[in-house]
């Protein structure tokens, strides 16, 4: 048998409280950056990805116009730097944070692993696991959590990704927190011809990554197992399920 796969998902956490209404520390970008630096993403990608995960520091994957390979390792594991950033932000003694999680898709395992790394820099994390999708989604929009576990790999055009995941009021920004600098780049992107959008889309990725609006941990693939007697099983970022019309007997 043969195996074909394409990266479609980034497992990590989303900061739901970027204004610091529930967890004041999260309003400071240095704190969010510290929480990224505190995680050994190389180790987690090997363990949680079944040996096939890839450590990442960005939500954007190959196939998206905003993908920038140079950002993939932006937050390399650095506990000393994480602690210094917390100190600089006024949280040398850490703080407490509650994360919304769920038992499906390996979310609880990821949450627990991340929490153990955060504990090492003084951040006490409580995991509130919801047993069903409905309860998880209710919690996501409740305004009660500082963050939530997420699976949000962006392979679509950046404008679509923004409207889905970053725009104030979207599912992953339920607090409707405005981000003026990001919105200015988005406005520029919307006014740019699609054939020339790449450089501007990468600016969106750069801003989201540098401001640590998320905690990406690892990228995972969607795999297809198929017989060597056929060919044309070539999933892509824009067409994850192979087109059945392209599947033909192997020559």
Give residue spans per PLM region.
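Envelope-exposed proteins and targeting segments
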Residues: 9-11, 95, 121, 213
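Short helix-loop capping/hinge motifs at secondary-structure junctions, enriched
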Residues: 19-31
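Short helix-initiation/N-cap motifs at beta->coil->alpha
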Residues: 102-105, 127-138
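Structural transition elements
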Residues: 22, 54-88, 106-107
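Short, conserved helix/loop micro-motifs enriched in His/Cys and acidic residues
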Residues: 64, 87-101
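A local structural motif
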Residues: 92-98, 116-130
């Amino acid at each position: 048998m043969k195996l074909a796969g394409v990266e479609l998902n980034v497992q990590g956490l989303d900061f739901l409280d970027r204004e610091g209404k529930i967890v004041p520390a999260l309003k400071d970008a240095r704190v969010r950056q510290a929480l990224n630096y505190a995680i050994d993403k190389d180790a987690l990608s090997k363990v949680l990805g079944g040996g096939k995960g890839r450590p990442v520091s960005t939500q954007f994957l190959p196939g998206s116009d905003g993908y920038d390979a140079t950002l993939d390792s932006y937050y390399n594991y650095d506990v000393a730097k994480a602690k210094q950033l917390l100190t600089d932000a006024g949280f040398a003694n850490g703080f407490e944070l509650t994360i919304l999680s769920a038992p499906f898709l390996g979310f609880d395992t990821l949450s627990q692993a991340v929490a153990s790394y955060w504990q090492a820099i003084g951040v006490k994390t409580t995991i509130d696991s919801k047993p069903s999708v409905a309860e998880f989604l209710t919690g996501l929009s409740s305004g009660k959590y500082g963050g939530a576990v997420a699976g949000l790999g962006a392979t679509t055009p950046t404008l679509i990704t923004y409207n889905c995941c970053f725009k104030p009021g979207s599912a992953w920004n339920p607090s409707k927190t405005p981000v003026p600098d990001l919105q200015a780049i988005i406005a520029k992107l919307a006014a740019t011809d699609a054939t020339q959008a790449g450089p501007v889309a990468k600016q969106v990725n750069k801003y989201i990554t540098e401001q640590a609006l998320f905690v990406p941990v690892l990228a995972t693939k969607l795999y297809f197992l198929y017989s060597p007697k056929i060919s044309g099983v070539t999933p892509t970022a824009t067409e994850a399920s192979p087109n059945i019309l392209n599947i033909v007997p192997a020559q």
